[in-house]
C-alpha cells in the first residue's frame, strides 16, 4: 500500500508534488493516523485534505473526511443546502460555510497563483459569498494592510510552532531610515482617490479569474469579473489615445470649453460611484507633492500620476483643477547629471517654467495664495497678465515651440496651474497663439536678413579673393631664386587673407542677426556659425579663429565710436550750459537803501570817477597789448627750439577756438556790458569805503601820480 515518494526537481517542491507524496494509515483503537515520509534536505509540503481523499479512496471509503462527517451528521442542513441528489465528487468539493475562507482564498491566489490553496475551498462557491470590491461602504484599510509585504527576517529558524503574530528581527538604524522612504515612494506612486484603487482591485480580481480552472461552473460572478476587466481596460484606453493626441491645435483657438460653464454638481456616473472620494483629492495631492519633494531629485518619477490626473479630469468633466497642474509637474522626467555631485540637469524649457513660477509667486499677494482653489474654480472676470509675466510666458512659448514644434496640452495644464489666478484657459490659449505667430514672423524676417547679409559677403569675397591669390602668385614668382633658406625647406607658404573694415562690418552684422533672440549657453551654435562662414573662403584661407577675431575687432571699433559720441554729447551739453550762464539779466543793478545823504555824495563822486576811468582805460589797454605781443614773441622763439611743445600749444588753441565758434555773434557786446557793470560796482565800493579823504581817492584813481615829498630838515633855514 505504501508507495515511494517522488522527489522534487532542483527548483524546489511545488503544490502539485505535495499531493503525490505517499501516506500510510495507522490505526490504534478508534484513532486513525496518517504516516508521511519527509523528503531529505528539502521542505515537504503536505495538503491535509488531499491526503485524506487519497486515504479514503485507497481504503474503499472506510476513512471518511471531516467535511463528509459533518454533513452526514446533520441531514436537515444537507437537505437545505442541496435539495437534489449529489454525487460523491460534489460532496467532496463542497466549500466551508465560513465567508472569510473565500476572501482568504482569493488573497492567496493573488500571491501564490492557481494552486495557492490547492483548490480545496472555492471550486464551486456561490457567487453571492464573494467579496464585493465595488461596495464603497466597505472599508478596505485592513485589506490594504494585508497586501503589504514585510521582508524583514523572522526571529526563529527551523521547525517551530507559533501562536499569534510572527516575531521578526528589527532592522538596523540605517535600514530603518531607508525603509520608510521606499514605502513613501510607493504610496506617492499610488493614484489619489478610491476610483483608481477600485480599478486596481478589479484588475487583480480579473487576473485571478483568468487563472481559474475552466471546468468550474460559470456563474454570474465570472461574468461580472470579465465585465469589470473590460471596464478597466476601457477606462485606461483613453489614456493611451490622449498621450498620443495631447497637442494643442493653435488654429482652432476660438472653441469654448462647455465644461467650464457647467455646474460643479453635474457629474458623470463614474463620479457618482466614487462620490465619497471626491473631497479627499486635494489632501492626497498635497500629500503626494510633499512626499515627492522629500525624495531625491535625481530619480525619475513614475508616470502613474499623469494617468490619475487624466482620470480625475474625466471625473470633473473637464473642469480645470489645481491638482492636475501640481501632479503633472511630477510626471516630467528629470535627467541626472553624469558628474559625481548628482545634481539634476534641467532643460532650458524647465528652467524657463521655473523662472515663470518664481516670478508669479513673488508678484502674487499672500492673501491670494490662501484662496487658490477658489480662484481657480471661480468663473469670475480675472485680471490680465502683468508685463513681466507676459514676457516670461512668451519665452516659455518660444522655447517650447522651438524644441517641440507645438504647445502640448500637458504644458498648457501646467501653465494654467501657475497663472490660473490671473487668466482663464481660453485667454491663455489665445495669448499663446498670438505669441507663436509673432515668433514665426520674427523668425522669417531674421532668416531673410541673414540670407541677404550672407549673399553680400559672398559677393565681396568674389572680388577680393582673386586679387589676394594673384598677389600671392606674384610674390612666389619674385622670390623663386636659386638661393633658398635652409629653414624654409619642407614648409608650405602660409596663405593669409587680410580682411578690410567693410567685410568685418558685414561679418559683425551677420553675427548680430544670428545671435538675436538666442538663449544662453549657445556656444555650440556660434561655433558652428564660425565654421560655416570659414567655408565661404576657398582653399582654407580663413579659419574659425580669424572669423571670431574679425568680429571682435569690429565690436571694439563700435564700442570706441559709441564712447566718442558720448563724449561729444557731454561736451555740447557743457558748452550750452556756459552759454546760458553768460547771458546777462535785463534788470539793472540795485543797491541797498541807506541814508539819503550818502546816496547824494556817492552819486556826485561816481560821476567824477567814471569819467576819469573812461579816460584812463585806453592807456591801460595799450600797455596790456604791448606786454601780450612781447609774450607771444618769446613763445615763438621757444617753440622753434621745441617742436613738441608747439604741437601741444596748437591742440590747446584749437579747443578754445571750437568753443568760440559755438558762441553767438553778440558775445563781444555781452563782454563789454559785463566789463562796464564790473567797473561801476568797483568804483561804488571805493566811494563807500573812503568818503572823506579826497586825496586818497585821487591816489586810487591816478596811481601813477607823484606823491608830495616831505621837507628836508637838514637844510639851512
Swiss-Prot record:
Compartments where located: Nucleus; Nucleus, Nucleolus
GO CC terms, sorted: nucleolus; nucleus; rDNA protrusion
Start-end of Basic and acidic residues biased regions: 623-632, 653-665
Disruption-associated phenotype: No visible phenotype.
Pfam families assigned: HUN
The UniProt record lists the keyword Nucleus: yes
Biased composition (Polar residues): 214-246, 285-308, 706-717
Matching InterPro entries: HRD (IPR014840)
Segments of skewed composition (Basic residues): 675-705
Keyword field: Chromatin regulator, Nucleus
Primary localisation category: nucleus
Residue span of region Disordered: 114-136, 166-308, 620-717
Biased composition (Acidic residues): 118-136
Short sequence motif Nuclear localization signal: positions: 634-641
Superkingdom of origin organism: Eukaryota
GO biological process: chromatin organization
Nucleus listed as a keyword: yes
Family affiliation: Belongs to the ubinuclein family.
Subunit structure and binding partners: Component of the HIRA complex made of UBN1, UBN2, ASF1A, CABIN1 and HIRA. Interacts with HIRA.
Function: May be required for replication-independent chromatin assembly.
Name this protein carries in UniProt: Ubinuclein-2
Organism of provenance: Arabidopsis thaliana
Classification of source organism: Eukaryota, Viridiplantae, Streptophyta, Embryophyta, Tracheophyta
